[in-house]
Amino acid sequence: MSAILSADDLNDFISPGVACIKPVESLPQKESQSENPYEVTKEDKVQPENLPPAQISLTDCLACSGCVTSAEAVLISLQSHTEVLNTLDSYPELPLGSTSYQRGTQKVGSADSDGRIFVASVSPQVRASLAATYGITEREAKYMIDQFLMGPHGLRAGGKHGNGFTWVVDTNVMREAVLALTADEVTSSLLSTGSGSLPKSPILSSACPGWICYAEKTHPFILPHLSRLKSPQALSGTFLKSVLSKALGVPPSQIWHLAIMPCFDKKLEASREELTDIAWASTFTQSQTTPVRDVDCVITTRELLTLATARGLSLPNLPLKPLPASCLTPFPDQALESFLFSKSSSGQTVESGTSGGYLHHVLQIFQARNPGSKIVTQRGRNADVVEYVLMSSGDEPLFRAARYYGFRNIQNLVRKLKPARVSRLPGAKPQAVSSSANRRQPMSRNAAPAGTGADYAYVEVMACPGGCTNGGGQIRIEDAREAVPNALKETSTETPVAAPKPTPHEQRAWLARVDEAYYSADSDSEGSVTTEPVSVLSRDNQIHEFLNYWSEKVDIPLSRLAYTSYREVESDVGKTKNAPNETARVVELAGKIGGGW
């Protein structure tokens, strides 16, 4: 697969394959059978049928295996800034800021109401991209987003209803929850003897939707290895809709959740059937008609700029300071609010990487449980492949793990994990497909032996080279030049007028600038209050207390709130189809225009 890639293909999405399940061309209209069967009709008399334009919904793309991901055009047309504006103008905002509103006691809506509660979640990679673009700190980028989504000078300054977002949360909080649960999952897998509810070793991270879509459609033997945990985006959606629905007495359908992410494939994730209220809601509160998504819409960092432009707003002109208390609405539960909007959320270090630090956290947990142990790092064939071995005080390997970023490296990992080829000859031994690859693996004198894939306990897998700060939806250097011509003087020596296409060196420098903003989130945190460092095990205990409190508050088991499932997507290309059933299936899919259910 990698042999046919070109420079134009090195982005976050792959255009639709030729085996798409929706027709995009119309055949000539058939003449009525009542006419003379012997009549000769000239070709120019045959008029094409006047059919409506073919549309491919995001749900259709997920039901098809002709491609790895959907096209950028499909993604933007279904989940974009236009959908955000249309939704804000279509529904009035439920009033939560009135004097009669009290925490957890005032019911603000009903199933018959047309109002909506608008909430948003923002990825730290988005803030880093904005910070690099406008030459501000990551904290100031947070203020900019809050002012735009919630403040009086942002979205609330226009539109039919003057709507804005009631709460904007940082996905870092739910990322920490996923990190704690990931360490539990890896520990249970190592101690398990093959429980059906646990993934097989090695456990592969599942937070990257591009990687998940690739595995489901091309390598189903990988699915038993995938972590069952939801991503921070999905867990944020489940948290917001379950808590607000319970506390405010509104159905999940009246809570509209927008996620701002660095990646186009996050739109795919939001459209999964497994990530709706049916997966977690109780019998008495779940939707009676159609499932409600945990994340209603996903836009990328670049689309956030487009959203501001569509409303005639300039993001850098917004106040780079916190919103006044009069513009903030208290969260229904004070205990959850103190955790959700806590300023002590852990930031990122260079060692943890740019994609959430899943592997780094697991290594820290196991190192804390084994005093005197040390982590030995060995770089792979490129910077996006790194192997880790936790060595005991007696230099015995305790734990092996790895990081694989980018589809080229992912394919090498998949080949390592591919089951042994069973010979058809009687008495022949099965041959592992990765033996030759292992012989070619370079060895360092002081490093631990390289892993074969199967001996890893955990692997952090991300589709984008360089990780999530390099997501396909991030602001590119050419976009930043147009947005702020003077903000990139140190990155580009050219004048902002008619600037040439960025060179690879300039693109690497730009990505390094985004990474720097991402890693500096802790150093520019608001205020000068210093807190005592919390050990990784103590922080894990705090996270588990929060998760247990959430589960008890909504009266739903944590297993239904935080975990999900995956399924093989089979190709029907070239198979004999039952015409009536196939027609019904296509008609059903065609009715799901706009990514609906």
Swiss-Prot record:
GO terms under biological process: iron-sulfur cluster assembly
GO cellular component terms given for this protein: cytosolic [4Fe-4S] assembly targeting complex
Location of region: Disordered: 25-46, 424-449
Binding-site residues, [4Fe-4S] cluster 2: C208, C263, C464, C468
InterPro entries reported for this sequence: Cytosolic_Fe-S_CAF, Fe_hydrogenase, Fe_hydrogenase_lsu_C
Biased composition (Polar residues): 432-444
Residues that bind [4Fe-4S] cluster 1: C20, C61, C64, C67
Single Gene Ontology MF annotation: iron-sulfur cluster binding
Keywords, ordered alphabetically: 4Fe-4S, Iron, Iron-sulfur, Metal-binding, Oxidoreductase
PANTHER family membership: NITRATE, FORMATE, IRON DEHYDROGENASE
Family per similarity comment: Belongs to the NARF family.
Function: Component of the cytosolic Fe/S protein assembly machinery. Required for maturation of extramitochondrial Fe/S proteins. May play a role in the transfer of pre-assembled Fe/S clusters to target apoproteins.
Protein name per the record: Cytosolic Fe-S cluster assembly factor nar1
Organism for this UniProt entry: Aspergillus fumigatus (strain ATCC MYA-4609 / CBS 101355 / FGSC A1100 / Af293)
